[in-house]
């Protein structure tokens, strides 16, 4: 369960960071 969450977070967090800061 945790490894799955970590995998999702690893993909979602950079995408959110990209959208918020507009630094991709």
From Swiss-Prot:
Q: Write down the superkingdom of origin.
A: Eukaryota
Q: Does the keyword Disulfide bond apply?
A: yes
Q: What is its subcellular localisation?
A: Secreted
Tell me if Methyltransferase is a UniProt keyword of this record. Answer: no
Return the InterPro entries for the record. Antimicrobial_frog_1
Where expressed (tissue)? Answer: Expressed by the skin glands.
Q: Spell out the GO cellular component terms annotated for this protein, sorted alphabetically and separated by semicolons.
A: extracellular region
Which UniProt keywords are given for this protein, alphabetically ordered? Answer: Amphibian defense peptide, Antibiotic, Antimicrobial, Cytolysis, Disulfide bond, Hemolysis, Secreted
Which Pfam families does the record associate with it?
Antimicrobial_1 (PF08018)
Q: Name one GO biological process term.
A: killing of cells of another organism
Q: Which family does it belong to?
A: Belongs to the frog skin active peptide (FSAP) family. Brevinin subfamily.
Q: What does this protein do?
A: Shows antibacterial activity against representative Gram-negative and Gram-positive bacterial species, and a very high hemolytic activity.
Name of this protein: Brevinin-1
Species annotation: Pelophylax porosus brevipodus (Nagoya Daruma pond frog)
